[in-house]
Design a protein with these regions (language model features):
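Sec/Tat signal peptide C-region and signal peptidase I cleavage site
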Residues: 14-18
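Domain-level detector of nuclease and nuclease-like folds
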Residues: 66-225
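Sec-dependent N-terminal signal peptides
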Residues: 3-13
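N-terminal capping/interface segment
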Residues: 2-3, 19
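Short, His- and charge-rich active-site/binding loops that engage polyanionic ligands
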Residues: 20-82
Length: 225
């Protein structure tokens, strides 16, 4: 099950210069040296894994697996932005190793504090609820990275204007998917206002999310909300 999301994502996918695929214990990512953060982070979350066994480690640190070196403390300190998790720490609380690895800077992105602690957190909580209801979900999440973004820190970490999530329930008889795109700012409206089709997420990110699925199923999942 843990490799399912990797299969769905990686089939037919290629990495560009300055990008690196990294696989950690509980999640995988595609790191962008240009933007000093992940283009996407992907993981499976099961019902059992929503039961927290470990507390937050808060040991923010560079990712030793990033060959070009990742962002670090100096990029975020005093910037006014939160070190926003892409794969949430709360989704990794089932394992001490997974929890610790969720604090790698390769899993961080500069987020408006009101956004990170507000609607983004609520969406993360909603996804955990879906994992309980549907037994497991496949999650892909990340920033929308473009060439015109402002930057912070010595490593020039890009500040995304938008973030996305794509959630997939691929179990037989219950095949469904939903996407979300949200601005990196304080948001007062309900989560449902930002629900979109996977096709819409693909258009704004340029990522082909479910290339490993059969074409007919991929089209069905991506075109419907």
């Amino acid at each position: 099950m843990k490799n399912l999301i990797l299969f769905i994502l990686f089939i037919g996918q290629f990495t560009a210069s300055g990008q690196q695929v990294v696989r950690h214990t509980a999640y995988s990512l595609l790191y962008s040296e240009e933007h000093e953060q992940a283009l996407w982070v992907a993981y499976t979350l099961t019902k059992k894994e929503t039961i927290a066994q470990f507390s937050r480690s808060d040991n923010f640190r560079p990712d030793p697996m990033i060959e070009s070196k990742s962002a670090d403390d100096l990029d975020y300190i005093g910037s006014g932005f939160d070190r926003g998790h892409l794969a949430p720490a709360a989704d990794m609380a089932w394992s001490a190793e997974a929890m610790s690895e969720s604090f790698f800077y390769s899993n961080m992105s500069p987020q408006n504090p009101s956004f990170n602690r507000g609607i983004w957190k609520k969406l993360e909580e909603q996804i955990r609820s879906w994992a309980v209801v549907y037994d497991s979900v496949q999650v892909v999440t990340g920033p929308v990275l473009t060439a015109d973004l402002s930057q912070i820190g010595p490593n020039r970490v890009s500040i995304p204007k938008y973030y996305y999530k794509a959630i997939l329930d691929i179990r037989e008889g219950r095949q469904q998917a939903i996407g979300f795109v949200m601005a990196n700012e304080k948001i007062i409206w309900p989560i449902r206002n930002y629900a979109v089709s996977i096709d819409s997420v693909e258009k704004i990110t340029g990522i082909d999310f479910y290339a490993g699925l059969e074409d007919e199923l991929e089209q069905k999942l991506e075109s419907h909300l």
